[in-house]
């Protein structure tokens, strides 16, 4: 799938941020460049897998599996755009598992220039520019940096409905799917003037995606600080929820689809159903590295009205342990232990005007930013924080 090839850059970057080790980036550097698929671009930078640009050289450069040759039953197989799974198949016969199912793409209108694919492409270019700079390939750095800017401009010029401010599924389409809007939100593509419109649209759509798509949906929601809606969706008990798996289907393992009615032949052990594991750690408790190898960690809890929460989080520098007591809009307290050789940047929810923060009983300076108060350069060791007015 085209999507998976582009996601390799995201995986490589996450590995670097969590370990601080450049050896993998260095070893696979040329492979990573090819997996941006920048050679499939037209003049405006947007890429397509359907316009005859996918050559054998490109397939070989990204190491297309031999399995795909037999799977596609073609002499010259090509990439296929996923968006989400399963897809609707109007040509499926009655014996096929795809017969009669709606699919999980939110009626995505597949076009040559695909908004989902080009959103991934944009992010792959951004990451490749960072990797090039880290490794000292400055010509590549400027190429990928400039190409990313071009692609972002083209997406916003050619793939937005002017009146609604929403993204269409692809060039020539009039349909706006959930997927075509949550990926631009996740990757920071959306113009500021359209942000509220896109977020409102996403909230109206609910869980109109598979467990695979849910990962990206939650990333987008928490990146845009939509913690109330994010928690509502995460704890839903409808037929598109993790609670449905546990309480209704009796699952003890993450599944491929929300229910058999959405994919009759779903398997019972699919890793892509495990989004809550990282969403809770990285977004609700808010632990993310902002300097490679956790030299600096951001702690940005977005727990909304959860009363209490605890987490132990292993990093390459040691374990971060934290616990929170929360009375939404009234009280917030955090105990945290930061490992040696790590510095923290901690975000606290803004519950009051003229709010202040105490660390170990002493008032400390902070920076206010929209819905948060931020304290930087917190060193290692056990700390207690309270907000007050």
Task: Please name every model-derived segment.
Residues 18-117, 135-181, 293-294:
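Active-site acid/base region of carbohydrate-active enzymes
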Residues 4-10, 20, 24, 117-120, ...:
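Structural signature of alpha-solenoid helical repeat junctions
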Residues 6-9, 13-16, 26-40, 122, ...:
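Hydrophobic core segments within long, regular secondary-structure runs in both alpha-
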Residues 145-146, 153, 231-389:
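Non-catalytic C-terminal accessory modules of carbohydrate-active enzymes
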Residues 4-9, 15, 47, 63-73, ...:
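C-terminal capping/lid segments that line or modulate ligand- or cofactor-binding pockets
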